[in-house]
Amino acid sequence: MTDTHSIAQPFEAEVSPANNRQLTVSYASRYPDYSRIPAITLKGQWLEAAGFATGTAVVVKVMEGCIVLTAQPAAAEESELMQSLRQVCKLSARKQKQVQDFIGVITGKQKVA
């Protein structure tokens, strides 16, 4: 019970009990000695609903008695211009100069020779 000087504030749980999952730590066999090592397997449609689609990078934080999995946002796709720039950087110095000259011509900063 609360004492006379405190006010009970209702709160909503951060994680709904309906979203809780229970599992048991199993084991995986390790070659060549076939020793048993602890293993946890997570699978189900709920993973995608929680932001863990196939191919998602995951950061794992481990503490005593607690494991936190955090989905990492997908890296923004590189623009077509940046991809082209990376290709130009791999060219010889002569070809890089030709690309620079071409850019100068189409921007009007350089006259056609």
From Swiss-Prot:
GO molecular-function terms, A-Z: DNA binding; RNA binding; RNA endonuclease activity
A Pfam family assignment: SymE_toxin
Domain SpoVT-AbrB: 29-74
Compartment(s): Cytoplasm
Protein purpose: Involved in the degradation and recycling of damaged RNA. It is itself a target for degradation by the ATP-dependent protease Lon.
Gene Ontology biological-process annotations: RNA metabolic process
Principal localisation: cytoplasm
Keywords: Cytoplasm, DNA-binding, Endonuclease, Hydrolase, Nuclease, RNA-binding
Domain of life: Bacteria
Family: Belongs to the SymE family.
Name of the protein in its database record: Endoribonuclease SymE
Gene Ontology cellular component annotations, sorted alphabetically: cytoplasm
Stored HAMAP family: Endoribonucl_SymE (MF_01193)
EC number(s) per entry: 3.1.-.-
